[in-house]
Amino acid sequence: ASTGWLHTGDPALLLHTDKLFAALREKLDSGWFNELLRELFAPAPVQVIQVPTLPKKDDENAAPARTDGKLVLDHPLTVTDLGEGSPSAEGVVGTVAGAELLHHPSKGSLYLNLYYDLGGLSEEEVQYLDILTDMLDELDTPRHTARELNTLRSTWLGDSTACIAFWTGRQEGTPCHAKLVLSMSLLERSLEKAIELGGEFLYETKLTGEKAEAAFARVLSQQKLNMEQQFIQMGNQYAMVRAMSHYAVEYALSEACSGVTGYKFLCGLLEQADWAALGKKLEAVREKVLHHAALTISLHGSEAAKQKLEALLPGSVFAEEARGTAKAYTQELT
């Protein structure tokens, strides 16, 4: 895309091939390519002369180019060298601040994942929520600009992302599970910062105002360009997902968010360009999910980290007195 931008001023020129191929067909009919070949090669004809020569004889004293043999190790490695290993500690399930807490005892870095259930959402609401996750990095909060908050997240957290995840479960009936996921990796001493910054990032980003509306237009335009480029590069994969969307809920949701259907949804928002209405819709969906949907918190860390998390959550934005119950995401297949 950058090449088209540099030479023509249009970043999407090379992504739309209809005009390009139409121009090439026109030149093909007019004999333009034949004339080009004539101009390039007719003035200086090329002649290739083959001179047969006998191959050189190998030097009898030279070392052979290849030595046949088999590598023999003094102590070949086997499965027994791995040992039995340490068995993984069993996870512990509990509840805190209206959320289900899963603790997986481990040492080293701490991994904190929050899963908001999306089983009660419609397809359109999931589409809006998916767009929201693409916007969060570009939005200010009452306390920080987007750049300041991103810098703080990079400083205190090894990684922190928000996204939509969905998969087909192994339970009876193979239900589709859909979640809004906030993932953070960090050092144990930064757990308090993770709760603070993760909450600000997910709950407090401003979805109204001039800056937010400018971010909506900017991010959606870039998303549209990215999807068009991916259609060209991986069109077969998008076609496969679109075909599977008629048979499995997981693929239907994938198609709605990041497939051709999702692309058309995104194009519709760009054509309407009603950013104030989009901000209100995103606020409504965020309110429904963050404050009412079932929340499961997964912690990979020490017992001390678990105790600290249980102390931090009740006073955080993640705490709710009552939440709904998790359920499978359903969608009528066409």
Predicted regions and their residues:
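Proteolytic maturation boundary segments
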Residues: 3-127, 264-334
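M16 family metallopeptidases and their MPP-like homologs
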Residues: 1-25, 45-55, 102, 107-272, ...
